[in-house]
């Protein structure tokens, strides 16, 4: 859970103000500005206000939070900031707002006048639903829901991707190699830009003096170029530091390239890399990576919840990933980055009181208050009939009819394993699933049998994070068997992206004939067997 109190600037707020925060961002050259959103969707800013980056309509700094009336109720979804700084955000409705430093037209309004208050960015974006924004030092990018990318602002190294080095005063669609391709993620270094496609390909453009584009050379690129060295993997997340880049694949593999003055690549030395290198090879599967164009710090979180950091950490050069005691990558930047900015828009949850949901969670498997027990594999799980009836249609029918189970104090379960059934009952109390990927297939089977559609989605999410070349086809088969369409499509795409390796696994050849034929036919339709 993110604790905004780890950022020094938030010590200016009262406990009541801290308790109201649901989203937040710390930015600025000295981490001296902050924006936060409260639980009733009011937006506040405070801090130094350099270059009017607070958007308050004046150039006055403030230690007391000021409300940005124009953004209240807008439901901020994505936020980024530059070095000026300028601030860029998009709302859940896909609308983009910008303010602050504008010396290079990075606000996208066609001028170089500083923006003293949030103003909607309209040119070429008015009819687009923007789902993500990203900022370099003085350039901006926006990703639309249809996969198109727009860029504007400072373009001295080609970071706008227009094919020239002329500054771009308004949003311009990035084309060339990205034409008719669908981008699903964007990131900016100081003067470089990166994009991830829906098929896992990675493209980069802009400044490449440190090899941060991963192209095997250090020549600047005025238009997007594919990172060919990653052709054998499928990337699903990319982040940029000041002059380095990290990429995370769908198999949980982490790659790094670019500047390495502070060890931010995690390779064990300080040599720059012009091409991607696989790091954290001996660690467990990585599920999240973090970096920020303002800093030379890198962080990663593994499937087991372990958080690692490396690079510039409080003045030290950490050249290998170092295991921390943090629970999230955000804490690394709060405590060790220079400046101590946030690498993304923070989402905050609070535990300052016991909610109804938390009370229910506390009573799961509590013999003191339970009125029913399940016995699975000789082990007992204590539950409450009322909770089961409220949360599950299957149990509502069981306890409101003439089923024999309605009169029992102990119910035997033999069709599911203890870990699976316990995870299911715990889900009814907590609305979350705590189960390793290898057991999630059994829970997916249970969710299908009990018609628990939301639980099916949670199982699919867990399974997706645990997919590997070895189990991909088995998971595809399970998805088909349990009518999990989203998981089926995900597993199918994974198999296609790793077709050679998947077809050499035992799971592939152990599949029954009809399913194998169906897979081959579908793969053929999407061009998997083209020369």
Swiss-Prot record:
Name the UniProt record assigns to this protein: RCC1 and BTB domain-containing protein 1
A GO BP annotation: chromatin organization
CDD domains hit by this protein: BACK_RCBTB1, BTB_POZ_RCBTB1_CLLD7
Family annotation (Pfam families): BTB (PF00651), WD40_RLD (PF25390)
Stored SMART domains: BTB (SM00225)
Gene3D superfamilies found in the cross-reference section: Potassium Channel Kv1.1, Chain A, Regulator of chromosome condensation 1/beta-lactamase-inhibitor protein II
Gene name of the encoded protein: RCBTB1
Lineage: Eukaryota, Metazoa, Chordata, Craniata, Vertebrata
UniProt disease link: Retinal dystrophy with or without extraocular anomalies: An autosomal recessive disease characterized by progressive retinal dystrophy, chorioretinal macular atrophy, reduced cone and rod responses on ERG, and decrease visual acuity. Extraocular anomalies are variably present in some patients and include pulmonary fibrosis, sensorineural hearing loss, and endocrine features such as goiter and primary ovarian insufficiency.
Free-text tissue specificity from the UniProt record: Ubiquitously expressed. In the retina, present in the nerve fiber layer and to a lesser extent in the inner and outer plexiform layers (at protein level).
Function description: May be involved in cell cycle regulation by chromatin remodeling.
Record bears the keyword Cell cycle: yes
Subcellular location: Nucleus
Keyword terms of this UniProt record: Cell cycle, Chromatin regulator, Disease variant, Nucleus, Repeat, Transcription, Transcription regulation
Residues of the signal peptide: none
Ranges: RCC1 repeats: 40-91, 93-145, 147-198, 199-250, 252-302, 304-356
Listed PANTHER family: BTK-BINDING PROTEIN-RELATED, RCC1 AND BTB DOMAIN-CONTAINING PROTEIN 1 ISOFORM X1
Residue ranges of domain BTB in the record: 370-437, 470-499
Organism from which the protein derives: Homo sapiens
GO cellular component terms given for this protein: cytoplasm; nucleus
């Amino acid at each position: 859970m993110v604790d905004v109190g780890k950022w020094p600037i938030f010590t200016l707020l009262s406990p009541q103000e801290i308790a109201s925060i649901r989203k937040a961002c710390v930015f600025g050259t000295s981490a001296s500005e902050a924006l936060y959103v409260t639980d009733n969707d009011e937006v506040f800013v405070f801090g130094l206000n350099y270059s009017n980056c607070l958007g308050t309509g004046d150039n006055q700094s403030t230690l007391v939070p000021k409300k940005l009336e124009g953004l209240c109720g807008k439901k901020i979804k994505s936020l980024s900031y530059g070095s000026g700084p300028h601030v860029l955000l998009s709302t859940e409705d896909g609308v983009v707002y910008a303010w602050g430093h504008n010396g290079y037209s990075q606000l996208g309004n066609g001028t170089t006048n500083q923006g003293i208050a949030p103003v909607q960015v309209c040119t070429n974006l008015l009819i687009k639903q923007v789902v993500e924004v990203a900022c370099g030092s003085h350039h901006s990018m926006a990703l639309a829901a249809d996969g198109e990318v727009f860029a504007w602002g400072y373009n001295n190294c080609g970071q706008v991707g227009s094919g020239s080095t002329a500054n771009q005063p308004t949003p311009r669609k990035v084309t060339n190699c990205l034409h008719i391709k669908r981008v699903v993620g964007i990131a900016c270094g100081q003067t470089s830009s990166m994009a991830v496609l829906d098929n896992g390909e990675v493209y980069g453009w802009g400044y490449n003096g440190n090899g941060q584009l991963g192209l095997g050379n250090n020549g600047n690129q005025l238009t997007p170029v594919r990172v060919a060295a990653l052709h054998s993997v499928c990337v699903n997340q990319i982040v940029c530091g000041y002059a380095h880049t990290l990429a995370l694949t769908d198999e949980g593999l982490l790659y790094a390239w670019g500047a390495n003055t502070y060890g931010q690549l995690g390779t064990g030395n300080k040599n720059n890399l012009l091409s991607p290198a696989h790091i954290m090879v001996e660690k467990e599967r990585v599920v999240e990576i973090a970096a920020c164009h303002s800093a030379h710090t890198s962080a990663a979180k593994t499937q087991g919840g372990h958080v690692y950091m490396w690079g510039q950490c409080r003045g030290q050069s950490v050249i290998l990933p170092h295991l921390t005691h943090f629970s999230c990558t955000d804490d690394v930047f709060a405590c060790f980055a220079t400046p101590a900015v946030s690498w993304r828009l923070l989402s905050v949850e609070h535990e300052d009181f016991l909610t109804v949901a938390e009370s229910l969670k506390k009573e799961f498997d509590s013999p003191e208050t339970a009125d029913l027990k399940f016995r699975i594999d000789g082990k007992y799980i204590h539950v409450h009939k009322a909770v089961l009836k409220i949360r599950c249609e299957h149990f509502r029918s069981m306890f409101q009819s003439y089923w024999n189970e309605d009169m029992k104090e102990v119910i035997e379960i033999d069709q599911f394993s203890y870990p699976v059934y316990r995870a299911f009952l715990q889900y009814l109390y907590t609305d979350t699933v705590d189960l390793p990927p290898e057991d999630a297939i059994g829970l997916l089977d249970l969710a299908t049998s009990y018609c628990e559609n939301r639980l099916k989605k949670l199982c699919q999410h867990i399974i997706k994070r645990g997919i590997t070349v070895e189990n991909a086809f088995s998971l595809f088969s399970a998805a088909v068997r349990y009518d999990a369409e989203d998981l089926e499509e995900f597993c199918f795409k994974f198999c296609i992206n790793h077709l050679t390796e998947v077809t050499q696994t035992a799971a592939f050849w152990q599949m029954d004939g009809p399913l194998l034929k169906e897979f081959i036919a579908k793969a053929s339709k999407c061009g998997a067997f083209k020369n």
